[in-house]
């Protein structure tokens, strides 16, 4: 894990804020690309809520969130380690990258709160001229994939099939042909709230206990479900931790 950067005065000018942004961005990109195996190892799902920090000197750090409330700076996404083993590695890294981009912008414009309108536009223009963390991660991924056109085509077909499988699993608590009978599954109850199955609502099934849940009850959206390889409901997740 990289060491934290020493505390320095908050940047005030457009140039200084952009320099701070660039250093933090470089650290985050390094964590998700060059140092990805080390970063992955630090994000143990059994640990407490962890965050990925990028520092102005280009270093990165996986650590617990700041204890002071409110924090001195906007905080990055909390608990990135919890989703690590429930998603494909590539999808999880992309999710972390998206949250990292959001955090970088929030920090930059936190520092730029006292800039005037023209200065904020110039700051955003400087930031926007650089690839996002997600784009940097995707470019590196595509560079590896393009080494073999045949392999790339195969992976695309496989990914499409997997996405279709997830969509089918999470759309309703039964997978049947055109003869799907909604009345047959009206007795399916949500494992959290006990509500009856409704075809107009998003549901997701637990791969461990095979119970079904409203997506809203377990805080899973259709978009998030597409990136989950094996879903474990809150009860199954907590029981695993208690045994350990």
UniProtKB/Swiss-Prot annotation:
SUPFAM superfamilies: FYVE/PHD zinc finger (SSF57903). The record marks 197, 203, 207, 212 as: Histone H3K4me3 binding. Its main location: nucleus. The keyword Metal-binding applies. It is found in: Nucleus. Residues 137-178 are annotated as: Disordered. GO terms for cellular component: nucleus. A zinc finger (PHD-type) spans 187-239. GO terms for biological process: chromatin organization; regulation of DNA-templated transcription. Signal peptide: none annotated. PANTHER family: CPG BINDING PROTEIN, PHD FINGER PROTEIN ALFIN-LIKE 2. The PHD-type zinc finger mediates the binding to H3K4me3. Interacts with H3K4me3 and to a lesser extent with H3K4me2. Belongs to the Alfin family. Histone-binding component that specifically recognizes H3 tails trimethylated on 'Lys-4' (H3K4me3), which mark transcription start sites of virtually all active genes. This is PHD finger protein ALFIN-LIKE 2. It comes from Oryza sativa subsp. indica.
